[in-house]
Amino acid sequence: MRYPFLRLAVFLAACIAPVWWLYQAWIFALGPDPGKVLVENFGVATLVMLLITLSMTPLQRLTGWSGWIVVRRQLGLWCFAYALLHLSMYALFILGLDWGQLGVELVKRPYIIVGALALLGLLALAVTSNRYSQRRLGARWKKLHRIIYVILGLGLLHMFWIVRADLKEWALYAGIGAFLLLLRIPVFARRIPRLGGAAKARSVKVQNNG
């Protein structure tokens, strides 16, 4: 296994927020409506983890370090785990596990449908994020995993629909997401500098001048 300590660090870092929030809920430190806070926290955490996952490829191109790509799958799976926790908190604290209310909720809050579509997309990516699926799907695997961009759009729309009264935080995430998508466009991707390459070029230049 490559970069075992990096993988362990990612695992521990990803565990911190859920454990801390659940502990706060346990000691009644999340205010009068801890269930709502947990739903919101895990929803935002899912979006943040998705953005972090999408940043791995540009960071690899920028630095030339393969460690970013090594943990990309792990981060993506954590994104899916956060989304499942978001759904679980919603089912437990908002629905009260009363699935008969779900139809009413979907009519009253259609952004739930958008979130559900994003979750289904993450499920498809999580299920196929293994070497067997890569071999089985071949070229189609890469096409399938491009739906991560659609998932980002759905996630941002889901959040926008919920917090449209105060868009400051949403605008930050949307701006980061737009920037990361821009870096995927070939004409911009080719312009990402290589920090390692630049340092190497300077070193060669100094040696030549010496």
Curated annotation (Swiss-Prot):
GO MF annotation: an example: oxidoreductase activity, acting on diphenols and related substances as donors
Cofactor binding, note field: Binds 1 FMN per subunit. Binds 1 heme b (iron(II)-protoporphyrin IX) group per subunit.
Main subcellular localisation: membrane
Name of a matching Pfam family: Ferric_reduct
Compartments, as annotated in UniProt: Cell inner membrane
Coiled-coil features, chain-numbered ranges: none
Domain of life: Bacteria
One Gene Ontology cellular component: plasma membrane
Gene Ontology BP terms: protein repair
The entry's keywords: Cell inner membrane, Cell membrane, Electron transport, Flavoprotein, FMN, Heme, Iron, Membrane, Metal-binding, Transmembrane, Transmembrane helix, Transport
Cofactors, names only: FMN; heme b
Its biological purpose: Part of the MsrPQ system that repairs oxidized periplasmic proteins containing methionine sulfoxide residues (Met-O), using respiratory chain electrons. Thus protects these proteins from oxidative-stress damage caused by reactive species of oxygen and chlorine generated by the host defense mechanisms. MsrPQ is essential for the maintenance of envelope integrity under bleach stress, rescuing a wide series of structurally unrelated periplasmic proteins from methionine oxidation.
Protein name, per record: Protein-methionine-sulfoxide reductase heme-binding subunit MsrQ
Species for this entry: Pseudomonas syringae pv. syringae (strain B728a)
Source taxonomy: Bacteria, Pseudomonadati, Pseudomonadota, Gammaproteobacteria, Pseudomonadales
